[in-house]
């Protein structure tokens, strides 16, 4: 445990380093900490913090910078989340951008853009898993023996499938089949529909049964549980010296964006937690770059967590500003999707 004096100096050091991006010396700490301490006393405290692994000394400077462990202590125990921007203005902007009634994919993509614009870093969203369950289906006759199957999920996502049939169906027959399925099976997975059809096959005409089996087969041909990572504002990170000053680091950063595997893993872990999570590079093995941090929060549809969103930026980010941006966006995205 740190004593109050050491906590104050560590908090001041991290706040000044986030603001200025330069190693922090004893004179700066004396000026901003509010403590009446001699430079020698401050240097002694800094040496103690360095032994604890909370700060380090760059070879080219007499000042010190926070380590990942120091950042972790700061965000867990010292951070006061008071956004310098008007939270009401943020709320209005997010509400204006996230329009209820729009396709789910468009709303989720808009959330990534909002996060990027507000944070000036990269916004990232893990899209909801494709639903195994359907809310409504419709058959549309395209030509002889070719039918378009339209599937509407409970989240409002619309999926289309092509069905090749053994015979021609009239529009009236297609309406009859879709009405039967919607009346008896809406809210179930297509695997469950398949099982139910086996038990109810005697109640249906053979041609209707064949059409329904074709619909079930078509609906399950594509993976239902694929997740996608949407990223907006990657180019903002080119303006961040901490991430872009080294070409190898920059190449690794864009490899992360291109492959998305590590981001998918990190966001998936975040979806199992409540509230805002902070992953600090160099401390969390989930963050692939030491100088990068990710602030995430899960979002919901009708009370059920379906995905995660967040901001990717430098470890030296204004956490007190980014955290409320992520939190407000997650809450309003949840509200918008639940109104679909």
UniProtKB/Swiss-Prot annotation:
Any one GO MF annotation of this record: DNA binding
SUPFAM superfamilies tied to this protein: GAF domain-like, Winged helix' DNA-binding domain
Keyword Transcription: yes
Gene3D superfamilies: 3.30.450.40, Heat-inducible transcription repressor hrca homolog, domain 3 (3.30.390.60), Winged helix-like DNA-binding domain superfamily/Winged helix DNA-binding domain (1.10.10.10)
InterPro entries per the UniProt record, alphabetical: GAF-like_dom_sf, HrcA, HrcA_C, WH-like_DNA-bd_sf, WH_DNA-bd_sf, WHTH_HrcA_DNA-bd, WHTH_transcript_rep_HrcA_IDD
One Gene Ontology biological process: negative regulation of DNA-templated transcription
Keyword Transcription regulation among UniProt keywords: yes
UniProt keyword terms in alphabetical order: Repressor, Stress response, Transcription, Transcription regulation
HAMAP family linked: HrcA (MF_00081)
Similarity comment: family membership: Belongs to the HrcA family.
Function: Negative regulator of class I heat shock genes (grpE-dnaK-dnaJ and groELS operons). Prevents heat-shock induction of these operons.
Name the record gives this protein: Heat-inducible transcription repressor HrcA
Protein species of origin: Burkholderia thailandensis (strain ATCC 700388 / DSM 13276 / CCUG 48851 / CIP 106301 / E264)
């Amino acid at each position: 445990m740190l004593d109050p004096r050491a906590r104050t100096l560590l908090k001041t050091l991290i706040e000044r380093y986030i603001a200025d991006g330069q190693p922090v010396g004893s004179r700066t700490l004396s000026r901003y900490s509010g403590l009446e301490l001699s430079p020698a006393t401050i240097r002694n405290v800094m040496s103690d913090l360095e032994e604890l692994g909370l700060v380090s000394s760059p070879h080219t400077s007499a000042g010190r910078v926070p380590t990942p462990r120091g950042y972790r202590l700061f965000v867990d125990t010292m951070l006061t989340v008071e956004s310098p921007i008007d939270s009401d203005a943020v709320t209005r902007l997010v509400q204006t951008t996230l329009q209820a009634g729009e396709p789910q994919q468009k709303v989720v993509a808009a959330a990534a853009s909002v996060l990027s614009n507000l944070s000036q870093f990269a916004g990232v969203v893990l899209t909801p898993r494709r639903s195994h369950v359907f809310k409504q289906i419709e058959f549309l006759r395209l030509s002889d023996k070719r039918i378009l199957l339209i599937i509407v999920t409970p989240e409002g996502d619309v999926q289309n499938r092509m069905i090749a049939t053994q015979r021609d169906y009239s529009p009236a027959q297609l309406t009859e089949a879709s009405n039967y399925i919607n009346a008896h099976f809406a809210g179930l997975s297509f695997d469950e529909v398949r099982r139910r059809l086996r038990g109810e096959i005697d109640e249906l005409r053979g041609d209707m049964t064949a059409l329904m089996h074709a619909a079930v087969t078509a609906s399950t041909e594509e993976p239902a549980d694929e997740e996608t990572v949407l990223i907006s504002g990657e180019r903002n990170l080119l303006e961040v010296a901490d991430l872009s000053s080294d070409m190898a680091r920059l190449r690794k950063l864009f490899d992360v964006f291109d492959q998305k595997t590590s981001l998918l893993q990190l966001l998936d872990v975040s979806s199992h937690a409540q509230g805002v999570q902070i992953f600090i590079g160099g401390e969390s093995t989930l963050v692939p770059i030491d100088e990068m941090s990710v602030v995430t929060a899960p979002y919901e549809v009708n009370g059920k967590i379906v995905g995660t969103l967040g901001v990717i930026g430098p470890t030296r980010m204004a956490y007190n500003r980014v955290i409320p941006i992520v939190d407000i966006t997650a809450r309003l995205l949840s509200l918008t999707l639940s109104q679909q």
